[in-house]
Amino acid sequence: MSGHSKFKNIQHRKGAQDKKKSKVFTKLIREIVTAVKTGASNVPENNPRLRKALNAARSQNLPKERIDKAINSANDASNTESYTEIRYEGYAPNGIAIIIEALTDNKNRTASEVRSSFTKYGGILGETGSVNYLFNHCGVIQYPINIASNEDIFEAAIEAGGNDIISNDFAHTIYTDIENFYKALGFLTDKYGIPEDSYIGWIPVNTIIIDDKEKAKKLLKLIEVLEENDDVQRVFGNYMLSEDVYEIIQEE
């Protein structure tokens, strides 16, 4: 397990915290509904995916009444609302590999919108499996840096069954096998509380450093448009902004 990353965690991912709450809540509710419908129980202790979804909802301050409504809706036999999990893969400008995970009630609509976004911003939407070999599929659990010392979080990650941990100036990020993700998440949640973020995702094997401001802005625009789509849950890419470019963009 590695203790510290060589670079600051400066990969620019405009996540849920940068979106309007309505869009954040839409994505969270979809995940709750899907977790209930695909799980064996609507009791979080017996449904790890639901527990994770509820943790995410609470960390984003989704009102309790909306959480309860989503769970009740998913349990209503007369409610035919359902979402299909689907993955899209392609290349953004300058050869950046992109993986998109979506929950959709209309695959044709989502595919059309994702393809349109790629085309508009200079990317190419490929077939499923066209870029995933450039990533590791694993669990990710992130805590703020002040939750524990590097040594303590390192030991906790090992005990939880984590494979790797990276600590930088801002966060501790623990990586797990997919099979061990929910067990590790439960252990760490019991020890440190709800994490800032947790998910099964795609982590690049190698990253492409972007040190040109205009190239970075073009890429980030595509990422932003994709993440604004209600059907898109997460976007992953094998890129990292150089510190200089990151700071310039942050100042604009």
Swiss-Prot record:
It is found in: Cytoplasm. SUPFAM superfamilies: YebC-like. It holds the Pfam family TACO1_YebC_N. GO terms for biological process: regulation of DNA-templated transcription. GO terms for cellular component: cytoplasm. GO terms for molecular function: DNA binding. Keywords: Cytoplasm, DNA-binding, Transcription, Transcription regulation. Residues 1-22 are annotated as: Disordered. InterPro entries: Integrase-like_N (IPR017856), TACO1_YebC-like_2nd/3rd_dom (IPR048300), TACO1_YebC_N (IPR049083), Transcrip_reg_TACO1-like (IPR002876), Transcrip_reg_TACO1-like_dom3 (IPR026564), YebC-like (IPR029072). NCBIfam families: PRK00110.1 (NF001030), PRK12378.1 (NF009044), YebC/PmpR family DNA-binding transcriptional regulator (TIGR01033). Belongs to the TACO1 family. This is Probable transcriptional regulatory protein RT0442. It comes from Rickettsia typhi (strain ATCC VR-144 / Wilmington). The lineage of its organism: Bacteria, Pseudomonadati, Pseudomonadota, Alphaproteobacteria, Rickettsiales.
